[in-house]
Every structure is written in structure tokens, then in C-alpha cells.
């Protein structure tokens, strides 16, 4: 969990693929338009960019608003219930557009689509499309099918939430805006950590990493288009390649990747998110102060300062181990900017557990901490702990403390 945004953002597309004036659309009324709204983390933003690119390559253009769109897609988040409820409410409101345009196509993409699948058709009457996290490369094809069905007066529900080998290698195209100097690059998909509170292994699948050479070529292409700063994305990004690639001369695959990107001419800054404390090995810590392009910033989710809660969460480290990691990185990089994620109100969290977290936050002096109230996610181990649930008013109090 990496500081995900609670609200959704509509995707801004560059002129080469998206924006067209009203005069242009009036002159070419046959060009279908699409409105794509994104909820959640940076990985969702990157996925939406890939979807937008595939739609633009197929002849779609960006709609200036939902009301003007022939196709409306919501790329969803499932990390917390609030994010799902926002997307569901949004879609319910969007259905009213059918009064003026009965042919408008409505679809869910991403994590909630993956988690709920076909059941969304029962929840949301009139839904055309549900596409999961391993099928983003099929969105344009399925949208075409849904539009044809609507136009012919025989609308039908289309869903694809299956697993697909190699899907991690399909998120590689970009739609850059004019003078855009930053970009996200997805290096892996999925997570095998199975923290007790987290739905990501269900919605994103098993860990799969892209080849180093393929990532380097993508970054070179971005730099050739004016990008100066790249952020590498992965659910546990610093564990990149541990299933597919060997450790070489004591260097883990992620460090090997960073070293190769350090060599890319024209790239000025390199970031990554979100790492896991268990992946902060000595070789990665050593990159701070050694690799000139690696930004002096680390977002490292701690989740709790209580050893008891960390064990229940299945995090695989203690509060002191976390402290030692930060001390080592700060020793290498004294000016390091440090941010984190914290969950309060986890099932069974006592006042003493919360105070341990509070003390850790005070001691470390993070530049920023994203504090989240625990949100039960169906299918996780923590969701079964109803007997030890923390009252909502206590969660809120700790969240606001």
C-alpha cells in the first residue's frame, strides 16, 4: 500500500492521442470519444495511460466531459471499501446519461472489476463492460464489441477477468503531454506477500516481473521524448525479479535494474514506489549516495509500530528492524526525505499497540505519513477477525490524533 489517493482523477492525454477541439469533432463526428476516470494508486494511473493509448491507436479521441463521451470507463481501486463505493456511486449516476444517449458504453476496469467480476452486472443494471487487471490490453477490443452491440440495439454484458501469462509485459506504451518531463514505468505486477489486511494478491495476482532490457528500452524511449524523471512502479517494487532473475555478485535483480537505468543518457532522476521493508537489503541501501540519479526520497510503509500487530499483519519484520533500515539509509543519505503508510484500528489493536505506533512516528520524524483507518476487505485473513474489530469511533479518533 503506497499512499494511494482516495479520490479519482480523469486522465489527461497528450494532443497526439487525445485532445481534439469541438470544431474538430464537429467536422469528424464519426470519431468515437472516451472518458476515462482513475481511482487509486500510481499503478492504476499507469494502467489507465496504457488503456488510453490503446484506445487512441484504435481511433478513439478523448472526451472533454462525461456528457460528451461515447464511452465512459472507470478504472477502480479495491484497497479500501471507500474507493469501491465511490466508483459504484459514480457509475450509478452515469447511467442517467442514457436518457440522452442510449448508445453510451459504461465499463469498470481494474482492481474492483477483478475482485467482483460478473457480479457487477447484477449490482449495476445496464453495465456493458468489466475488465480485470491482467486484461488491460483487451479493453479497446471489448469496447468496440460493446459499442457495436449498443448501436445495433442488442446490448450485452462483456467481462474478462481471467489470468493471462505475460500480462505484465503489456503495460509499456505511453501518452505523453506536451513538455511532460516525468513518467511512470511499471516493472512488475502482483504480490506474493499476502499481508493479512491486503486484497492486492487477489486483485493483481502473483508476482510477475518484466525483463531488465525491456524496461531499459522503455525508459530510453521516454527520455528521447523529453522525459527527465522516471518512477518505477510495483506493489513490492524492491522485490522485483526475485522469481525470475538471479542475484549477481551480491546484487539483487532490483539493484541490477537501478544500475542499468543509471547508465541511460539523458535520464536525470529515478524514483520507485512502493517498496517493502523486507526488500530493503544491504545492496539496495548502498545505492543511496552511490547512484547519482536515485532521488533522495524513500516511501517505506511501516503500517504499525507494534511488534504484536506487525506479526498479526504478517509483515515479516519488527519495529526495531524497521528503525535500523531507516538509520542505515539515513547514514548513507543524510538529506533523505522519508514518508510512510500507517494503518490504525486494525482488528485487535489495543491502546498500547497504537501508542507504540505513535512513538515510532514521533521518533522517526517522517516528512509525511499517510494514516489510514483499517478497512476490512472480503477474502483477506483480517476480515475474518470480527470478534476483535475496533469500534469505528476509536478508528476515527486514532486517525485524527
Regions found by a protein language model. Give the residues of each.
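Charged/polar low-complexity intrinsically disordered segments
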Residues: 4-5
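Aromatic (phenylalanine/tyrosine) cluster motif
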Residues: 17-19, 24-30
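Proteins enriched for Cys/Gly/acidic motifs involved in redox and nucleic-acid/cofactor modification
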Residues: 30-241, 253, 283, 288, ...
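Conserved strand-turn element in the central/C-terminal portion of the radical SAM core barrel
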Residues: 194, 198-205, 269-278, 304-314, ...
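Short glycine/threonine-rich loop-to-helix capping motif typified by GTGT followed
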Residues: 244-248, 285, 348-356
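Radical SAM/AdoMet-radical enzyme domain recognition
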Residues: 255, 263-264, 269, 281-340
Amino acid at each position: 500500500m503506497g499512499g494511494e489517493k482516495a479520490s479519482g482523477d480523469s486522465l489527461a492525454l497528450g494532443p497526439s492521442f487525445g485532445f481534439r477541439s469541438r470544431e474538430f469533432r464537429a467536422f469528424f463526428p464519426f470519431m468515437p470519444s472516451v472518458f476515462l476516470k482513475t481511482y487509486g494508486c500510481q499503478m492504476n494511473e499507469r494502467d489507465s495511460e496504457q488503456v488510453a493509448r490503446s484506445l487512441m491507436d484504435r481511433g478513439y479521441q478523448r472526451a472533454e466531459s462525461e456528457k460528451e463521451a461515447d464511452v465512459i470507463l472507470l478504472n477502480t481501486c479495491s484497497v479500501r471499501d471507500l474507493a469501491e463505493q465511490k466508483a459504484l456511486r459514480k457509475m450509478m449516476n452515469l447511467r442517467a446519461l442514457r436518457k440522452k444517449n442510449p448508445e453510451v458504453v459504461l465499463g469498470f476496469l481494474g482492481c474492483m472489476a477483478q475482485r467482483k467480476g460478473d457480479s457487477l452486472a447484477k449490482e449495476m443494471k445496464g453495465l456493458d463492460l468489466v475488465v480485470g487487471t491482467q486484461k488491460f490490453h483487451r479493453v479497446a477490443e471489448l469496447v468496440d464489441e460493446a459499442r457495436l452491440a449498443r448501436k445495433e440495439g442488442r446490448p450485452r454484458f462483456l467481462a474478462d477477468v481471467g489470468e493471462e501469462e505475460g500480462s505484465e509485459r503489456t503495460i509499456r506504451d505511453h501518452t505523453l503531454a506536451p513538455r511532460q518531463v516525468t513518467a511512470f514505468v511499471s516493472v512488475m505486477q502482483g504480490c506474493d506477500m499476502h499481508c493479512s489486511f491486503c486484497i492486492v494478491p487477489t486483485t493483481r495476482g502473483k508476482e510477475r516481473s518484466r525483463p531488465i532490457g525491456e524496461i531499459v528500452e522503455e525508459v530510453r524511449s521516454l527520455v528521447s521524448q523529453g522525459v527527465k524523471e522516471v518512477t518505477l512502479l510495483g506493489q513490492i517494487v524492491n522485490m522485483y525479479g526475485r522469481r525470475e532473475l538471479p542475484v549477481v555478485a551480491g546484487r539483487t535483480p532490483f539493484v541490477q535494474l537501478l544500475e542499468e537505468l543509471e547508465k541511460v543518457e539523458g535520464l536525470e532522476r529515478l524514483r520507485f514506489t512502493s517498496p517493502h521493508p523486507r526488500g530493503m537489503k544491504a545492496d539496495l541501501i548502498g545505492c543511496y549516495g552511490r547512484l547519482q540519479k536515485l532521488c533522495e526520497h524513500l516511501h517505506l510503509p511501516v503500517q504499525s509500530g507494534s511488534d504484536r500487530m506487525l506479526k498479526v499483519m504478517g509483515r515479516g519484520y519488527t519495529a526495531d528492524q524497521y528503525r535500523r533500515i531507516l538509520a542505515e539509509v539515513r547514514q548513507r543519505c543524510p538529506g533523505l526525505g522519508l514518508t510512510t503508510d500507517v494503518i490504525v484500528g486494525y482488528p485487535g489493536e489495543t491502546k498500547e499497540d497504537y501508542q507504540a505506533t505513535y512513538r515510532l512516528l514521533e521518533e522517526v520524524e517522517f516528512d509525511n505519513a499517510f494514516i489510514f483507518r483499517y478497512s476490512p476487505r472480503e477474502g483477506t485473513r483480517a476480515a475474518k477477525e470480527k470478534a476483535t474489530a475496533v469500534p469505528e469511533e476509536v478508528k476515527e479518533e486514532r486517525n485524527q490524533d
